[in-house]
Amino acid sequence: MRNNKGFTLIELLVVMIIIGLLAALVGPRFIRQEEKAKVKAAKAQIELLSTALDTFRLDVGRYPTSQEGLEALRTQPGGLERWDGPYLKKEVPTDPWGKPYVYKSPGEHGPFDILSYGADGTAGGDGDNRDITSWEK
């Protein structure tokens, strides 16, 4: 009798099929969790930017204009004597999808609007592609 110490081709195929099935079941759930984490990160960054904008307003007496943008939280706009920044420790963040946040002041929903266009980078959308905004908590 021969003493074979290896796996047969059938055994290897069965293991590969099981691994493939597990990956097919777990993979989409992992991707959804990653997108949920990005949405939560965008909401947290918008909250951080909102707090910095409120501090800017307390010092200067107004929010940065749309032209000055969020960069006014890092570098002093011309003609502002009471600017006491920088109001962010690091550079103005991009959204979790690598795109800049949209800032409007005055805003349509409050004194300012901050939004990310989500995963697809375009206005509107549903699910992972929906916009993340400062006015929707």
Feature map (PLM): residue ranges:
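A structural feature recognizing the 12-helix transmembrane core of secondary solute carriers
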Residues: 7, 29, 33-36, 43, ...
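Phosphate-coordinating loops and pocket residues in cytosolic domains that bind phosphorylated ligands
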Residues: 27, 32, 68, 75
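Short, intrinsically disordered low-complexity segments
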Residues: 1, 28-31, 39, 56
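Short, compositionally biased strand/turn segments
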Residues: 6, 71-72, 76
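Short, surface-exposed interaction loops/tails
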Residues: 36-40, 47, 51-54, 60, ...
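N-terminal single-pass transmembrane signal-anchor helix
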Residues: 2-30
